[in-house]
A protein has these predicted regions:
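Generic alpha-helical propensity signal that fires on short helical segments
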Residues: 40, 64-68, 96-100, 149-151, ...
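Conserved nucleotide- and phosphate/pyrophosphate-binding catalytic cores
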Residues: 223-434
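Short alpha-helical patches at coil-to-helix transitions and adjacent helical residues
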Residues: 63-67, 142, 213-214, 310, ...
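Predominant activation on well-ordered alpha-helical scaffold segments within soluble catalytic domains
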Residues: 116, 184-187, 193-196, 215-218, ...
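Short acidic loop-to-helix transition motifs that present clustered carboxylates
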Residues: 188, 213, 401
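NTP-dependent nucleotidyl-transfer catalytic core
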Residues: 1-210, 218, 225-230, 243
Length: 434
């Protein structure tokens, strides 16, 4: 994220305090003592942390919720610690369904670097409350089995641990749960204890599905240090129709542009349902309560214009990928829907658009539209392709073509080797000349 975007971000000063804003935005599902936490956030400048385990090469939309909570707390004057789990990532937190595959130390170390780079883009590392990055391998990697059992494990009761929601589900499943994953909650509790000792950290934030792990830390600090510390669990974002948020055709929406292009990312947000878009604006943008209220009115009165979805898609894509790639993405989207010029797109953006379309490679001596339509599957035969062309039902790069012998000329090729072929209103495909 650019410095300009970071500098433009601010909390809504119409709220009494940051706690009230977090609650209004729907970012608090569960917490430790609410009254004490609100008072601490209002009266003190807390050091807080959020942990991210390197179980993949990129963060995804679920992590974006946590990153934005961190940024909102930082804007309120609190001190952020971004923890990447080079230690806990060697195990991975228990999943609801089955045991994780253990990744090699080399892969985990590589992913740690990748996640650190991503997290750093969402926080400010300048000023009085500059963010800091930490890696729990720094203390966990030095811990012997004896020290772990004597100094940490002694404070955990198995009866309490097995009641944690995910552990209980796994224990009742056919596969069960290994001691490795069962012990994960102890390791996360250790993180909070170490950060409390080293940095005076008194607040941890995370997803509500991690609540058992969060409270492992608060309880460990209470037993070992005799201190009361805080935790916030954010809700798991769900769609109004019951489908899982953060997935597109079953695939996670990653924050890394190499794993999910800015174009695909933008389209994901643009397709948000009317019933969900206001909640998404609250969680994923820095728009004020008044601004979001205006979009709520537009959804109620002019939903067909989809202005709220367009603003949401712009804000979140710019937040994650930057303003320039977002503007290129919007230009690409408009071109695909016949409202823009493909020739105005840079090659990188054009390629990301083509990745979303059916595509074929054709040699320079086969650039006739009959071949293009049949190879793309837009015509079942050459005779059908001729009929489509005769009726003017095809276009190249948004320009309608007609005539059975129509060719894609070298002048029409985008960046010297690409073309977008359309049949009718819905069928579009990409041609690459080889």
């Amino acid at each position: 994220m650019s410095a300009d975007i970071l500098n433009a971000q601010h909390n809504d000063d119409t709220f009494e305090n940051i706690w009230q804003e977090l609650k209004w935005r729907g970012l608090v599902h569960v917490s430790t003592d609410e009254e004490a936490l609100e008072k601490a956030l209002s009266d003190e400048k807390l050091t807080f942390y959020t942990g991210y385990d390197p179980t993949a090469a990129s963060l995804h939309l679920g992590h974006l919720v946590q990153l934005l909570v961190m940024r909102r707390l930082q804007l309120a004057g609190h001190y952020p610690l971004g923890l990447v789990g080079g230690f806990t990532g060697l195990i991975g937190d228990p999943r609801q369904t089955s045991e994780r595959v253990l990744n090699s130390r080399e892969v985990v170390a590589e992913w740690v670097q990748s996640l650190q780079s991503q997290i750093e883009r969402f926080l400010s590392f300048e000023g009085e409350n500059a963010a800091r990055m930490v890696n729990n391998l720094d203390w966990g990697g030095q811990l012997s089995a004896i020290d772990f059992l004597r100094d940490i494990g002694k404070h955990f009761r198995v009866g309490t641990m097995v009641k944690k929601e995910i552990v209980a589900k796994r224990l009742n499943s056919e596969e069960g749960i290994s001691y490795t994953e069962f012990s994960y909650q102890i390791l996360q509790g250790l993180d909070y204890l170490e950060l409390n000792r080293q940095y005076g950290c008194t607040l941890q934030t995370g997803g509500s599905d991690q609540w058992g792990n969060l409270t492992s830390g608060t309880e460990l600090i209470r037993k070992v240090e005799g201190k009361t510390v805080h935790a916030i669990g954010t809700p798991l974002i769900t769609n109004s129709d019951g489908t899982k948020f953060g997935k597109s055709e079953g695939n996670a929406i990653w924050l890394n542009p190499k794993m999910c292009s800015p174009y695909a990312f933008y389209q994901f947000w643009l397709n948000t349902a009317d019933a969900d878009v206001i909640d998404r604006l609250k969680v994923f943008t820095f728009l004020t309560r008044a601004e979001i209220g205006e979009y709520e009115h537009k959804v109620e009165t002019e939903a067909y214009k989809r202005e709220a979805q367009k603003r949401l898609a712009y804000e979140v894509t710019a937040l994650v990928h930057g303003v320039e790639p977002t503007e290129q993405t919007i230009a690409a989207s408009e071109a695909l829907f016949g409202k823009g010029d493909f020739a105005a797109l840079d090659e990188s953006t054009l390629q990301t658009v083509m990745d979303e379309l059916p595509s074929v490679e054709l040699s320079s001596d086969r650039l006739d539209l009959i071949t293009a339509l049949t190879e793309l599957g837009f015509a079942s035969s050459k005779s059908e392709a001729r009929r489509i062309l005769k009726e003017g039902g095809a276009s190249v790069n948004g320009v309608k073509v007609q005539g059975e012998d129509a060719l894609i000329s070298s002048e029409q090729l985008l960046h010297g080797k690409y073309a977008i072929v359309r049949r009718g209103k819905k069928n579009q495909g990409a041609i690459t000349v080889v």
